[in-house]
């Protein structure tokens, strides 16, 4: 069976535009909140049965054209030697942001990090992938994912504080230490994706969310070479690859050369301009998730406007410019998904 999402990743013709949304499994869903009333966030991430349950729920509830593994970009950090916790948040269940108890600050800290062995260190993720595939019964494909080296490093180095000051200072003051850190995080990303695909993931998205914090020369030295290596590793698995970032519209042409099948863009650029600047790859995005918080008729109209601007050329996937926000009405999500499915060029 050829899924329209996978076909769009390869810029092949599809019967309708595929749609999925980042954070489509999350706190805006009553079904997700019901699960989270019983377990903490990390407990959820470490339960294959619950991983499958919350991953598949949005497919049943909204009819998305792809599922994405429910996990976290930092889930492997404890296996690398870092003390990861999530703040208690409003409900006391780990709803807050991540905290690293022993952040990476020195070369000795970097040298002490261990590249994880997913089968031994992250079996619940791989078992979760297998459980999802069984539950989906090939209705839609499953996307695996990891965090990009810079984004994961921003949490590992900053320790959970807002901003990027310590990490960016490391780039300039101790570039060899920064490269050593990115090397280990790149290796960690590659082994995770390889094992996710071996377990059944049918595509791979790299969440390099905070890439827009870097100047072009720093991207060239500290990011793009590592992202290209991850893209090559995904290519060897045979599944499509997606690179997601925000604040990087100035660098689209360069990002198109990293080796990814799909470039996911944020809402800060017109989608027709993004497609024109990315002629050799598929494009994903770039609906502003805040629209889903507004009037339903506006949300639907803007989705249709985006589809018209994206055009009929194969290789477009409807998604958000970032994740679904807490408090988003589920009715708006369903209305937009239905509008995308109903849209046609004939």
From Swiss-Prot:
Subcellular location as annotated: Cytoplasm
Protein name: Uroporphyrinogen decarboxylase
CDD domains: URO-D (cd00717)
Catalytic activity: uroporphyrinogen III + 4 H(+) = coproporphyrinogen III + 4 CO2
Pfam families: URO-D (PF01208)
Any one cellular-component term (Gene Ontology): cytosol
HAMAP family tied to this protein: URO_D
This protein's encoding gene: hemE
Annotated site location: Transition state stabilizer: 72
Cystine bridges: none
């Amino acid at each position: 069976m050829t899924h329209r999402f996978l076909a769009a990743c390869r810029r092949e013709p599809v019967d309708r535009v595929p749609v999925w949304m980042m954070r489509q499994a999350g706190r805006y869903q009553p079904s997700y909140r019901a699960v989270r009333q019983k377990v903490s966030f990390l407990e959820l991430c470490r339960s294959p049965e619950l991983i499958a349950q919350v991953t598949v729920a949005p497919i049943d509830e909204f009819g998305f054209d792809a599922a994405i593994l429910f996990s976290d970009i930092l889930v492997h950090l404890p296996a690398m030697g870092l003390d990861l916790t999530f703040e208690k948040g409003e409900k006391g269940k780990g709803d807050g942001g991540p905290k690293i108890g022993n952040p990476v600050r020195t070369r000795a800290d970097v040298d002490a990090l261990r590249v994880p062995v997913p089968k031994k260190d992250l079996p619940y993720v791989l078992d979760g992938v297998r459980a999802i595939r069984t539950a989906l019964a090939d209705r839609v494909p499953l996307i695996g994912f990891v965090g990009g080296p810079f984004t994961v490093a921003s949490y590992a180095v900053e320790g959970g504080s807002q901003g990027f000051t310590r990490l960016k200072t490391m780039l300039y003051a101790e570039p060899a230490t920064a490269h050593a850190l990115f090397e280990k995080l790149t290796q960690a990303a590659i082994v995770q994706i390889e094992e996710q695909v071996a377990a059944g993931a049918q595509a791979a998205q790299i969440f390099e969310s905070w890439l827009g914090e870097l100047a072009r020369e720093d991207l060239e030295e500290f990011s793009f070479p590592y992202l290209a290596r991850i893209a090559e590793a995904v290519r060897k698995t045979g599944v499509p690859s997606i690179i997601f970032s925000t604040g990087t519209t100035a660098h689209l042409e360069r990002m198109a050369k990293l080796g990814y099948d799909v470039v996911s863009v944020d809402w800060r650029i017109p989608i027709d301009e993004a497609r024109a600047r990315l002629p050799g790859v598929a494009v994903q995005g770039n609906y502003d998730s805040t629209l889903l918080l507004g009037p339903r008729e506006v949300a639907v109209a803007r989705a249709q406007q985006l589809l018209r601007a994206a055009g009929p050329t194969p290789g477009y996937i409807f998604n958000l410019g970032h994740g679904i926000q807490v408090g988003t009405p589920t009715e708006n999500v369903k209305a937009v998904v239905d509008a995308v499915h109903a849209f046609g060029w004939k």
